[in-house]
């Protein structure tokens, strides 16, 4: 017998009529970090297994893209349920004859990361950020929030030391580490980088997301990173001092423009106004 895609009972069918009633209730709550702080939905990336009678009753996949508001919710029959996050049992909830509201305390710490460039300007991390836990080698793909104004990115992670793997907008962040501690609410990182930004127009119109900006180190002629322009044709990188080659290419990798840029001790603007591009 299933309800909302969840197996709630198994019955044996024999000869003759059978009737069995089920009364279910709602079990719901918010997700809290280990200090009792409510975890915002935009940092969710959790798979929680709910068991009943030593069997999997429900798999809760909670991400920033999940439907509804924050927290968890599912239909439950009367009984006792155990909640697991990885190998950790994080809660046990008993449903009797009414709805249950109980928050789940996750074995993670919610922290805001503030990253500043060499001119003490906050760097917004709006693209995917990849972190690797140095003890477990577990990879975490995180996403910044474009509406964030007082921090670069927020995370809710298990305690430990993490290494930045990739961030296409700032190549030099790779290899940097942060340590998530229970008594830490904020991490400040001072990066020796400067902002390179610009706008790209093609035949008088703002370039679309099929247009890519490719970055090379001039002295090494080696590929460094790339990004697609946004809806208005804008792009942004955060770079260490040096000389760079900036290329504009189409989705098929055809190069339609190229400029050389020197990043010294200030932010740089490099716009492109490309004509006769098909």
Please give the residue ranges for each predicted region:
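Structured interaction patches on ligand/partner-binding surfaces of diverse proteins
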Residues: 1-19, 84-102, 107, 167-187, ...
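Hydrophobic loop/turn residues within beta-sheet-rich immunoglobulin-like superfamily modules
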Residues: 18, 75-77, 98, 107, ...
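A short, amphipathic beta-strand motif
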Residues: 27-33, 111-117, 196-202, 272, ...
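A short beta-turn/strand-edge loop motif at beta-sheet boundaries
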Residues: 36-44, 120-125, 204-209
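Beta-strand signatures of extracellular beta-sandwich domains
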Residues: 47-49, 128-130, 212-216, 247
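Short, acidic Ser/Thr/Gly-rich low-complexity loop/linker segments typical of extracellular
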Residues: 51-71, 132-153, 217-234
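Short Pro-Gly-centered beta-turn/loop motif in secreted/extracellular proteins
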Residues: 64-82, 146-163, 168-170, 234-245, ...
């Amino acid at each position: 017998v299933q309800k909302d895609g969840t197996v709630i009972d198994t019955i044996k069918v024999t000869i003759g009529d059978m009737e069995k009633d089920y009364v279910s209730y709602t079990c719901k709550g918010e997700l809290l970090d280990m200090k009792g702080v409510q975890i915002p939905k935009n940092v969710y990336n959790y798979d929680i297994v709910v068991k009943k009678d030593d069997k999997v009753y429900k798999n809760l996949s909670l991400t920033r893209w999940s439907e509804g508001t924050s927290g968890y919710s599912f239909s439950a029959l009367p009984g006792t349920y155990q909640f697991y996050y990885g190998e950790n049992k994080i809660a046990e909830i008993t449903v009797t004859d009414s709805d249950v509201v109980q928050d789940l305390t996750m074995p993670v710490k919610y922290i805001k990361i503030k990253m500043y460039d060499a001119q003490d300007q906050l760097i917004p991390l709006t693209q995917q950020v990849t972190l690797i836990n140095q003890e477990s080698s577990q990879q975490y793909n995180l996403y910044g929030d474009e509406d964030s104004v007082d921090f670069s990115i927020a995370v809710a992670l298990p305690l430990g030391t993490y290494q930045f793997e990739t961030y296409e907008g700032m190549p030099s962040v790779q290899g940097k580490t942060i340590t998530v501690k229970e008594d830490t609410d904020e991490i400040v990182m001072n990066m020796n980088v400067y902002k390179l930004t610009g706008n790209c127009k093609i035949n008088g119109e703002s370039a679309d997301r099929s247009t890519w900006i490719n970055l090379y180190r001039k002295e090494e002629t080696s590929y460094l990173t790339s990004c697609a322009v946004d809806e208005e044709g804008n792009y942004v990188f955060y770079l260490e001092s040096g000389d760079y080659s900036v290329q504009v290419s189409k989705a098929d990798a055809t190069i339609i423009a190229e400029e050389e840029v020197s990043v010294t001790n200030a932010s740089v603007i490099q716009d492109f106004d490309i004509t006769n591009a098909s």
